[in-house]
Every structure is written in C-alpha cells, then in structure tokens.
Amino acid sequence: MSFISDIKTVKEKDPSVRSSIGIILTHNGMHAVWIYRVSRLFWKVRLKLVAKIISNVGRFFTGVEIHPGAQIGKNFMIDHGTGTVIGETSVIGNNVLLYHQVTLGGTGNDKGNKRHPSLCDNVMVAAGAKILGNIHIGTNAKIGANAVVLK
C-alpha cells in the first residue's frame, strides 16, 4: 500500500490535477482507493466486520463502493468515481483506470467462490460500463462508455 505511488498515478493519468495537495484534499476516486486499502488490511487479518464498516463509511463519503474482499493491484485509479461499484471477488491488475459509474458486479447466476470479473493489467473502463459475472478482461483492453460486458 503506497499512498505516494497512488498520488503519482493520479498525476500521470488525470490532466485536471494540478498538485499533490489537490489530490489529497479533493480527489474523490483516490479517497475511495485509500479507504479501500485500509479496509483491505482488516479484511486480510480476518477482521471482516471492521473492514466492512470502514468500507461503508468510505461509500458514504465518496459514493464509491469497493468491497474489501476485492483484490486490486498497483497504480489503480478511479476518475470521478461516484456510482462505481467493485464486487467482493473482483480481481484488478496493475495500471487499471476506471471512470465513474462503472460496475464490476455479479450476475446472480454464479454460485461458486468467484462471482465477479477479473481485469488484467493496463485496462481502461469508461464511464457507465457494466462488467458482470466471472469473466476475464485481457491485458490492455479498453471497455467503452455504457458497455455491458457479460462474456
């Protein structure tokens, strides 16, 4: 978990960012990622109730829901963020960028342990896209705005 690395990622990927202090104080998506990273620490040591409480507080303040069970790689960024949902068994690689109102969710049909999507490295998912179910999105993929991906 590197807050410094997260700040560098936002500076590289978001052209509207002017300063590190601006990210720390106002970048909604980054706040959500930081809250996720803290909740994930509690999840990994089996303090799941604490992790879920932290996650819910984060959702209240940011409008972004990231389940603490999700696995997220380095240099992950959510731009704008509000309405984004990342499910419990989602796996997200390195250098992934999500825009607002993206859902990495389940379909209700997958009854096994893995119910949510896996995104490889260098994936970009545009605003409003829904990626549902236990599916695999390959390296360097770009998912368009408002796309619904089921297979």
Can you say where each PLM-predicted feature lies in the sequence?
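Terminal amphipathic alpha-helical/low-complexity segments used for targeting or macromolecular assembly
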Residues: 1-62
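Left-handed beta-helix
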Residues: 62, 67-68, 73-74, 79-88, ...
